[in-house]
Amino acid sequence: MKKIILLSGIILCSVVATAGEVLLRFGAISDNHLDRTRPATFQRTKQAFELFKKHNVDFFVDCGDVADTYQPDMFQLWRRLYSEVFSDAGTRPDFLMIPAGHDRIGTTWEQGYGDFVKLTGSGTVNPVKCIRGFHFVSIAQKEKPDILKQNLANAATGSPAGTPIFVITHYPPMNTTPGTSSASGGDKNYRAILNNYPQAVVISGHTHTRLMDERAIWQGEFTAVNAGTLAYTDNAGIANATERCYSYDASIWEVYKNKIVIRRFNVADGREMYPDSPWEIPLPFQKKNAPYNRENRMKNFPVPEFNQETAVTFHPVRHSWDRWGTLNFPSPENSRSLNRYRLVLEKCNSDGQYGHHGIIEFVRNKAAGKMECLSFSAGYLEPANYRFTLTPVNYFGRSGTPAHGKFKVRKVPWKEIKNDYVPVVFSGRKEGQKLTPDSEGFFSAASDFRLVLPHEIIERSIQDKKKLIISIGIECIGAGNPARLRIVNGSGRIVTLDSICFRESAQRQQYTAVFRPSDKQNYSLLIRNGDPGKYRFSNIRFYLY
């Protein structure tokens, strides 16, 4: 039974129910990135709505970046897909959605947000709703934090003690889910406000974190969950052969009197991820016993293990423009807990002795099958014999039993076209000021900054109809490794085909990227979501293949 009382503009909601009764079932999506040039984005949003309809949700939320850029027709498309899938207006679920930065790229914040609200039918920029006895408050990107502060205070006044308050944001609170350690990934003002509301359950987007990532749920002073993305996912923080892959994430939330159950889905086929073990949040919230706080996860989350008989085989790739070979091996036990593989390389010298050469880490892009295959470029590996230790690592940094092997690297037929480039660095993703290095060649930078690629090599690549290969050493002082490295064009759009980072030490890594310029515009290497610090570039080389 639901009770709703209105007092002085504050909605007082309460629910009387048994422990086994679902009080509210709602869906969550984010980062649709609808784009008129990419019809596949339409399909993924439609599939999410169809999933919500199949599971008979009462309500759903969309956490922003609905369009890839300011495209009013994409706001209209969102509304049309919603109306088509939920064709019966009498049973159509309500929704709460907020605009975000991509929704206004190409116009002003005011124009972008105004058209978003008008054409999607969201009602307002920062909607507040009470659905079946539960408060939902929201704040759109770039809106004043005081809006969140006031709406949370009102919701807390209108909710019984211990009842969850759902908070919808685009940027996650800082230092919660993956990708939120810097100002370009997480919001410190949200975090400061939410620390005072242990009953808050935050649902956010922005970082394109996969829902299969077990770190997408976090508990500390409150609970935070990343809603994933319906567009693409970047491999934040770890080098990988595959830059990005398409994403089909949606979740369905079931709220009970004593818990919240979060079920994760792939909208492409409607299948639930890990149906035997959905995320469960006990109610009311208790920080010490919260199952998804880092201390409990480090202690209880399983570690992937290779068995003693695991054999890793090397297969050369003789006719590939970007890869010199693959490593093939059986998936480890407890593969669901697997986040990445760490490959430690040793190189054989002329005396036949092996010495430490460096480390490569590979993110797992999808649920592991019976066999795994890792493939990568050779721009930083000289022709030689190598041996390796391959270790599975879980989402919280714990390593399992490693496997070992050897391989030989052949010479890659690349043609070097430039090796005397002096770094030209600007702040920002596509705009910003030119940065000046200090006497030792270090650039002081925070968050996003970019290394401009020489225009003559772009022209040469287009003229010769060759792919362009870039190899760059990056040294960091006073900062963690850059979270993401991407090649972007003059408009700031990511164009990299393939890349990998080779970590030679805690401070230095070699980055190799392969891409094909499409026109004679400006291109840059974007260092994205990095921590503030000093960066120096060295061993910069360009090749054609």
Regions found by a protein language model. Name each.
Residues 10-18:
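Hydrophobic h-region of N-terminal signal peptides that target proteins for export
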Residues 17-75:
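N-terminal active-site segment of His-dependent metallophosphoesterases
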Residues 22, 158-204, 211-217:
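Active-site-proximal segments of metal-dependent phosphoesterases and phosphodiesterases across multiple
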Residues 28-30, 59-65, 93-101, 139-140, ...:
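Active-site neighborhood of phospho(di)ester-bond hydrolases with catalytic His/Asp-centered motifs
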Residues 244, 251-362, 366-372, 393-421:
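A short C-terminal boundary segment appended to hydrolase-like catalytic domains
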Residues 379-398:
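Beta-strand-rich modules
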Residues 412-545:
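Extracellular and organelle-lumenal recognition/adhesion modules and their flexible linkers in secreted
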